[in-house]
């Protein structure tokens, strides 16, 4: 891992997690943290416009110790805080790195956003974008940077497909067409379906040491 300039703490891998409101971003972070926290040193930065609600949710769920979670109140458009002016998020990541000098990984969860949201490369080394089946099978073919450019696309809540009339086969075909050669995974996070594929992606693409 790289070091911060003249500092005694390393720079952790930073993974941006984006997606529309209700798609399952916070639920994904909760289950990821609980699953790999004994193997890696983890922290989380959450973004909300006027509150720190997502940070509180993760703390109440005991996903991580409270001092490993920072909630950023963006006070405006959540896109700006992860793209045009990521200074608040960058400061939060650095604060966590100072608190925990051997930090391996920081997740940066965006505020609820739309398909056009992207993370500044200064803020995120890798990006995961979460959509959910309940939004309808048309979502993958709508495109947008979240669909086409994210390093990993997570299509969540596959258990709801029969209830909303969505075809997972159609969604998979559209996803493969919209992001050729880029990975995607279908998940039901409540049952842990697809979780290991996400973890494998993080470890492999993030070049984290493999820990049994």
From Swiss-Prot:
GTP binds at residues 19-26. It comes from the Bacteria. CDD domains: UreG (cd05540). Coiled coil: none annotated. One of its GO terms (molecular function) is nickel cation binding. One of its GO terms (biological process) is urea catabolic process. GO terms for cellular component: cytoplasm. It holds the Pfam family cobW. SUPFAM superfamilies: P-loop containing nucleoside triphosphate hydrolases. Keywords: Chaperone, Cytoplasm, GTP-binding, Nickel insertion, Nucleotide-binding. It is found in: Cytoplasm. Homodimer. UreD, UreF and UreG form a complex that acts as a GTP-hydrolysis-dependent molecular chaperone, activating the urease apoprotein by helping to assemble the nickel containing metallocenter of UreC. The UreE protein probably delivers the nickel. HAMAP family: UreG. PANTHER family: UREASE ACCESSORY PROTEIN G (PTHR31715:SF0). Belongs to the SIMIBI class G3E GTPase family. UreG subfamily. Facilitates the functional incorporation of the urease nickel metallocenter. This process requires GTP hydrolysis, probably effectuated by UreG. This is Urease accessory protein UreG. It comes from Vibrio parahaemolyticus.
């Amino acid at each position: 891992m790289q070091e911060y300039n003249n500092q005694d703490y390393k720079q952790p891998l930073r993974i941006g997690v984006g997606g529309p409101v209700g798609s399952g971003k916070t639920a994904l972070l909760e289950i990821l943290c609980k699953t790999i926290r004994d193997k890696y040193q983890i922290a989380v930065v959450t973004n909300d416009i006027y509150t720190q609600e997502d940070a509180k949710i993760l703390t109440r769920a005991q996903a991580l110790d409270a001092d490993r979670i920072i909630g950023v109140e963006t006070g405006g458009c959540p896109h700006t805080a992860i793209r045009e002016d990521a200074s608040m998020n960058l400061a939060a990541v650095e604060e966590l790195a100072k608190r925990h000098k051997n930090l391996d990984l920081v997740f940066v969860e965006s505020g609820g956003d739309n398909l056009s949201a992207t993370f500044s490369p200064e803020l995120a080394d890798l990006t995961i974008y979460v959509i959910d089946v309940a939004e309808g099978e048309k979502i993958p073919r709508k495109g947008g940077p979240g669909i086409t450019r994210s390093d990993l696309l997570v299509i969540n809540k596959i258990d709801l497909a029969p209830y909303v009339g969505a075809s997972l086969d159609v969604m998979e075909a559209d996803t493969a067409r919209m992001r050729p050669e880029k990975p995607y995974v279908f998940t039901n996070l409540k049952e842990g379906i697809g979780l290991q594929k996400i973890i494998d992606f993080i470890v492999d693409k993030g070049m984290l040491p493999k820990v049994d």
